[in-house]
C-alpha cells in the first residue's frame, strides 16, 4: 500500500489548525492533526520540508517502522515541533490502516473496553455566581465531570476565565505579540477554595469536580493548596507546578491525597516516566497530537497501567477535530482510561471537519465509520487562511516573568 501523496493544510476556521492528509496508491486517504497552539507554522514547515517528502513511496502499513524512522532518524529527538509532526503522520497512517480493514479504529486497536467515553467540560466566569450559572447549564446537558475556573478578585484576568459571559474560554490572542497577564499566587490561594465550597454547597457531590492550576504554584504552595481542598473531593488538580523538575512532586504527594493530573505539555514516554514510575500522579494528560500519535500514546498508557495511573488526555479546541476523533477511538479502547477533556467546537469548525462522533449523557462515542470517522473539506478550509495568534505570558505583580 504505497504512499503517493502527503499534503499539509493550515487553516483558521475560528482558530488555527494544522492538518496532514496522506494518500495511498489505492486511493485511501488518512488525516492527522499536527496543531501546536501558537507554533503552527514551524510544525507545518517541519512536515512539508522534512517528513512529507520522505513518506512518498513508503508502505503505509508499516506504521511502527515509519514512526521509528522519523523519531530516530532525525537525531534531534523529541520536542513539541518534532513530535507534533510525527503524531500527525502516525494518526493518518492509523486512519488509513483502519479504513483498509473496513473497521473503526477502536476495533483495530482491540475493541471497546467500555460503552462510552466520559468527557469533562469547562465552566468559567468572572464571578462565582457566573460559574454556578455556567455549571448548571453544563449539568443540564448531562456532563458527569466538570472543570471549574473563575476570575480572582483583584486580578484583571486569569487562566480559564472566558472573555465574556456565555463564551467559551479562548486563551490565545490575535496578533504578532502575546498578551501579558498579571498573576498573584496569594490572591488565587485565598479565593479558589471559596469557589469549590460554593459549587459543592450548591450542587453537591454528584459530578466529578476538576480544576486546572496551570503550572502557577511552587511545590510547597501546591502541597498546601491540595491539602486544604481535600474536603471538596476533587477528581483532580491539574498541573499544580511546572513538571520539568519531576522530583518536586514528591513534596506535593507527601502532603495531600487530592489526585494529581499532569502531562499536557509532554511529548514522549520519557517525559512521563519518573512521575508514573514513582506514582507521583494519578492521571497522565498526554495527547495524541503532541506525544507521538496512537503509537506513542499506546506506549505511555501501557506503561502507566502498570502503576494504576489512568489517562486523562488534553483535548481543548486548540487541538483540531481530527485529534478529538482519534482520541475518542483511543479512549474507547484503552483499558486504563480515566476521562477525556472536551470543550466542543464551533459550527464553523465542524463544517470544515465533518465528524461522526456522538454525545449523550456525559459520554461520547466515536461512531463506527471505518477509520477515524472524520473528514476534511479542503475547499472550505481554504476560505479560512492562517491568522497569527499566541498564548499569553504571565508576570507577577512586581513584573517578574512567571509560568503561564
Swiss-Prot record:
<keyword id="KW-0456">Lyase</keyword>
<dbReference type="GO" id="GO:0009063">
    <property type="term" value="P:amino acid catabolic process"/>
</dbReference>
<keyword id="KW-0460">Magnesium</keyword>
<feature type="binding site">
    <location>
        <position position="341"/>
    </location>
    <ligand>
        <name>substrate</name>
    </ligand>
</feature>
<dbReference type="InterPro" id="IPR034593">
    <property type="entry name" value="DgoD-like"/>
</dbReference>
<keyword id="KW-0479">Metal-binding</keyword>
<dbReference type="GO" id="GO:0000287">
    <property type="term" value="F:magnesium ion binding"/>
</dbReference>
<dbReference type="GO" id="GO:0008927">
    <property type="term" value="F:mannonate dehydratase activity"/>
</dbReference>
<dbReference type="InterPro" id="IPR029017">
    <property type="entry name" value="Enolase-like_N"/>
</dbReference>
<dbReference type="GO" id="GO:0016052">
    <property type="term" value="P:carbohydrate catabolic process"/>
</dbReference>
<feature type="binding site">
    <location>
        <position position="238"/>
    </location>
    <ligand>
        <name>Mg(2+)</name>
    </ligand>
</feature>
<comment type="similarity">
    <text>Belongs to the mandelate racemase/muconate lactonizing enzyme family. GalD subfamily.</text>
</comment>
<dbReference type="InterPro" id="IPR034589">
    <property type="entry name" value="D-mannonate_dehydratase-like"/>
</dbReference>
<feature type="binding site">
    <location>
        <position position="212"/>
    </location>
    <ligand>
        <name>Mg(2+)</name>
    </ligand>
</feature>
<feature type="binding site">
    <location>
        <position position="37"/>
    </location>
    <ligand>
        <name>substrate</name>
    </ligand>
</feature>
<feature type="active site" description="Proton donor/acceptor">
    <location>
        <position position="214"/>
    </location>
</feature>
<dbReference type="InterPro" id="IPR013342">
    <property type="entry name" value="Mandelate_racemase_C"/>
</dbReference>
<dbReference type="Pfam" id="PF13378">
    <property type="entry name" value="MR_MLE_C"/>
</dbReference>
<feature type="binding site">
    <location>
        <position position="264"/>
    </location>
    <ligand>
        <name>Mg(2+)</name>
    </ligand>
</feature>
<dbReference type="InterPro" id="IPR036849">
    <property type="entry name" value="Enolase-like_C_sf"/>
</dbReference>
<dbReference type="Pfam" id="PF02746">
    <property type="entry name" value="MR_MLE_N"/>
</dbReference>
<feature type="site" description="Important for activity and substrate specificity; Pro is observed in family members with low D-mannonate dehydratase activity">
    <location>
        <position position="316"/>
    </location>
</feature>
<dbReference type="InterPro" id="IPR053379">
    <property type="entry name" value="D-mannonate_dehydratase_GalD"/>
</dbReference>
<feature type="binding site">
    <location>
        <position position="122"/>
    </location>
    <ligand>
        <name>substrate</name>
    </ligand>
</feature>
<feature type="binding site">
    <location>
        <position position="314"/>
    </location>
    <ligand>
        <name>substrate</name>
    </ligand>
</feature>
<protein>
    <recommendedName>
        <fullName>D-galactonate dehydratase family member RspA</fullName>
        <ecNumber>4.2.1.-</ecNumber>
        <ecNumber>4.2.1.8</ecNumber>
    </recommendedName>
</protein>
<dbReference type="InterPro" id="IPR018110">
    <property type="entry name" value="Mandel_Rmase/mucon_lact_enz_CS"/>
</dbReference>
<dbReference type="InterPro" id="IPR029065">
    <property type="entry name" value="Enolase_C-like"/>
</dbReference>
<feature type="binding site">
    <location>
        <position position="318"/>
    </location>
    <ligand>
        <name>substrate</name>
    </ligand>
</feature>
<feature type="binding site">
    <location>
        <position position="264"/>
    </location>
    <ligand>
        <name>substrate</name>
    </ligand>
</feature>
<feature type="binding site">
    <location>
        <position position="285"/>
    </location>
    <ligand>
        <name>substrate</name>
    </ligand>
</feature>
<feature type="active site" description="Proton donor/acceptor">
    <location>
        <position position="159"/>
    </location>
</feature>
<dbReference type="InterPro" id="IPR013341">
    <property type="entry name" value="Mandelate_racemase_N_dom"/>
</dbReference>
<comment type="function">
    <text>Has low D-mannonate dehydratase activity (in vitro), suggesting that this is not a physiological substrate and that it has no significant role in D-mannonate degradation in vivo. Has no detectable activity with a panel of 70 other acid sugars (in vitro).</text>
</comment>
